[in-house]
Curated annotation (Swiss-Prot):
Keywords associated with the record: ATP-binding, Ligase, Metal-binding, Nucleotide-binding, Zinc
Protein residues bound to Zn(2+): C187, C195, C198, C201
Function: Catalyzes the ATP-dependent conversion of 7-carboxy-7-deazaguanine (CDG) to 7-cyano-7-deazaguanine (preQ(0)).
NCBIfam families referenced in this protein's UniProt entry, alphabetically: 7-cyano-7-deazaguanine synthase QueC
Protein name per UniProt: 7-cyano-7-deazaguanine synthase
Pfam families: QueC (PF06508)
Residues that bind ATP: L7, S8, G9, G10, M11, D12, S13, S14, T15, L16, A17
Known pathway: Purine metabolism; 7-cyano-7-deazaguanine biosynthesis
Keyword Membrane among UniProt keywords: no
Entry cofactors: Zn(2+)
Signal as UniProt keyword: no
Domain of life: Archaea
Organism listed in the record: Methanosphaerula palustris (strain ATCC BAA-1556 / DSM 19958 / E1-9c)
Length: 221
């Protein structure tokens, strides 16, 4: 069996690639640079994870148009990344408009070209509270798009094993599978030392703390 894994180099996508391999899939890893401010570190992390998995392929692609669009603190350096605030009612400014539809479209093209059986994307329970393109309904709808838009006789499963899990659940699973978390990167803001205050850092640190563990990546003091 073959699977395309969207691999950002973060905690969720890296763990998910290990899960896919554990399920018996041969991994074809796809890393997409959409202009995010930590891309250099993310690419380094994704490359290390793909190597540790002995992936069949690791393909990095550039999607520069997201940077041209702006509207997100991840792609526009003029917008400060939001500090995590669990009481913030509005969409966080780290939302990249309709990003996952773009990523999944490219992953579908790649999967169909490789006769792959599945695509894995690491959306999880905390994501779809803040990001509309991580909602279960969106994933279900995109599965229909894939079924309708690929060649007759083609079926590629869009798999989201983490959609009902918390970051702590994911970390626990990854530790069981031996994911090298020291090679992953989650921070939205920094590439040398994680900021510790963005939403991604917050949930990562919380997961390690809930399991009584120290996060192996460096953080600002």
């Amino acid at each position: 069996m073959k699977a395309v894994c969207l691999l950002s180099g973060g905690m969720d996508s890296s763990t998910l690639a290990y899960v896919a391999k554990d399920m018996g899939y041969h991994i074809h890893a796809l890393h997409l640079n959409y202009g995010q401010r930590t891309e250099k570190k993310e690419l380094q992390s994704a490359t290390a994870i793909a190597r540790s998995l002995s992936a069949e392929e690791f393909i990095p692609l550039d999607l520069g148009y997201f940077k041209a669009f702006g509207k997100s603190s991840l792609t526009d350096p003029a917008i400060d990344v939001d500090v995590f605030d669990e009481n913030r009612p509005e969409l966080p400014n780290t939302y990249v408009p309709f990003r996952n539809a773009n990523l999944l479209s490219i992953a579908t093209s790649f999967a169909e070209s490789r006769d792959a059986d599945a695509i894995f994307i690491g959306v999880q329970a905390l994501d779809y509270s803040g990001y509309p393109d991580c909602r279960p309904a969106f994933i279900q709808a995109f599965q229909q798009v894939m079924d309708l838009g690929t060649a007759d006789g083609t079926h590629i499963d869009l798999l989201t094993p983490f959609i009902g899990l918390t970051k702590t659940d994911i970390l626990r699973k990854g530790l069981d599978l031996g994911v090298p978390y020291e090679h992953t990167w989650s921070c939205y803001q920094n590439e040398e030392k994680a900021c510790g205050v963005c939403g991604s850092c917050h949930f990562r640190q919380k997961a390690f703390a809930e399991l009584g563990l120290s996060d192996p990546i460096p953080y600002e003091e």
